[in-house]
């Protein structure tokens, strides 16, 4: 039988609502790391949050893909019906927006030479796989990647290991296997909401020692994922709208006294 204070605490935490993204450039400084705010709300305008490029002074780089808008170090190639990542992208580009196109895969040389690329947005494409080699010498050092509203059935295993934020919400991912997250030990935020995830293999989350936010809402999980107590920096967990029928006393916090970990800011368990 659980103590009443513990049940009350979990009930209060379970009412936490998802974060609301105000703008794509809403950086939050967290121990010196710029983090982009999340957008997990369904039905949101997929173009909201992208900078108003008309308000930015243009640069006169000769390298700008046909049909794209290039301002400063931002390249916006959205809504062009592109079937592949365009060529002739300036090597000093830091943000590349490719949302609302028909790109079906990421190939090994798509981003070759883009050593300063910080953020890549691939929302609402037809991406079902990535054929990048994990050790591809393309110099890509992404911090932020969003492949939402696509056709992924699993977590790609060949994305840059430099990622701090990976958002794969609104796909068709069904499971998280042990080796899926092996490369991504630097992740601070992982978004996997609105998928079809039924199973998370034990030990999968152990490869994410710096994780602070985990979004697993709107999936088909029947229990709280194993390994959450071991993530000492984890502060936010979204598990609402799943099929979770019970919560164990040790599902979120480590066993024993004197075990140091960050305090939770939010745990959402409603609609289970």
From Swiss-Prot:
It is found in: Secreted, Extracellular space, Extracellular matrix. Residues 1-16 form the signal peptide. Found in several connective tissues, especially in articular cartilages. Residues 55-91 form the LRRNT domain. Its main location: secreted. InterPro entries: Leu-rich_rpt, Leu-rich_rpt_typical-subtyp, LRR_dom_sf, LRRNT, SLRP. Keywords: Disulfide bond, Extracellular matrix, Glycoprotein, Leucine-rich repeat, Proteoglycan, Repeat, Secreted, Signal. SMART domains: LRR_TYP, LRRNT. Disulfide bonds join 64-70, 68-77. LRR repeats lie at residues 92-113, 116-137, 138-161, 162-183, 186-209, 210-232, 233-254, 255-272. It comes from the Eukaryota. Residues 17-37 form a propeptide. GO terms for cellular component: extracellular space. PROSITE patterns: LRR (PS51450). Pfam families: LRR_8 (PF13855), LRRNT (PF01462). The two attached glycosaminoglycan chains can be either chondroitin sulfate or dermatan sulfate. Belongs to the small leucine-rich proteoglycan (SLRP) family. SLRP class I subfamily. May be involved in collagen fiber assembly. Homodimer. Forms a ternary complex with MFAP2 and ELN. This is Biglycan. It comes from Sus scrofa.
